[in-house]
A protein has these predicted regions:
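Active-site bordering "gate/hinge" segments
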Residues: 1-178
Length: 178
């Protein structure tokens, strides 16, 4: 299983220029059929999808032209614990992200009188989850989320023009520091 959510907002000239929210999820199945490993995947989660997955595994195994055998990984006895910084992506509102994006753009414009344009100010967030299970008892799950911000600016000083930007990829919303 894999699933995730994403959010993206961009500002230009004090207004929202782009706004996207998306969710996706899917499940993949691998299995042996006729001595060969087949695989199939779907983004549907209904009774018909189960039948289509099974039929897809059979069909893909039948179409294989190699005699090489894939192996279903039985897993390890132990896995290391990965320390992750706690994220507040799930509890941060769209309104707060929009406000932060507009603020990033406004502060970039106001930072120096030589700044003539802020062509990009963006705030995004993403979260994802992956679950791996198999017939040997493997049952692993991982999830994560983060924010992303980007601001670019154009400055002029006489005949000289400079372009610069700032990127942040924090786990917590307050890590996006204008």
């Amino acid at each position: 299983y894999h699933g995730g959510d994403s959010f993206n907002v961009s500002a230009l000239d004090g207004e929202i220029s782009d706004y996207k929210v998306a969710s996706s999820c899917g499940v993949s199945l691998r299995g042996m059929f006729g001595g060969k490993m087949g695989s199939a995947s779907t983004e549907a989660f209904d009774a018909d999808a189960v039948r289509q997955l099974i039929d897809g595994v059979k069909e893909s195994a039948t179409l294989l032209e190699t005699d090489e055998q894939d192996e279903i990984f039985a897993g390890e006895e132990r896995y290391p614990t990965i320390e992750k910084e706690e994220s507040d992506v799930a509890t941060t509102s769209a309104e707060a992200k929009i406000e932060k994006c507009l603020k990033l753009e406004a502060l970039a414009k106001a930072a120096d009188p030589r700044i003539v344009r802020v062509p990009s100010a963006m705030v995004a967030s993403s979260s994802s989850e992956v679950i791996l299970r198999n017939s040997y008892g493997l049952n692993l799950q991982d999830s994560g989320s983060y924010f992303f911000s980007y601001t670019s600016l154009v400055a002029k000083d006489g005949a000289s023009t400079a372009v610069n930007g700032k990127v942040a990829v924090p786990s917590r919303f307050d890590g996006i520091d204008p």
